[in-house]
Amino acid sequence: MVNSNFQFSYMLLDRLRQDCEYYLGFGGRCARQLWAHDEQAQINKMRELYDLVPEKPQWLTREQIDAYAKQMGVK
């Protein structure tokens, strides 16, 4: 069960994940399709939120975030 204090963080993290999927697919790798409008900023925010939430989501791992970063050409 999601801790209600972190509900927004989980929701935003999932939104960022979905943005990455779109960016890498039908979004044509256009940074303005991302929530952060910048690839590195998007990945940084995902890592920040992932580290913040006490219960890690089953639908996203740190390794997946790193894979998104690699596919997007950022660290």
Residue ranges and their predicted role:
Residues 12, 46, 65-68:
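Generic structural signal of hydrophobic/aromatic residues within well-ordered alpha-helices
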Residues 20-62:
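Acidic, low-complexity, intrinsically disordered interaction modules
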Residues 1-33:
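N-terminal acidic leader/helix
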Residues 1-7, 57, 63, 67-75:
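Short intrinsically disordered terminal tails
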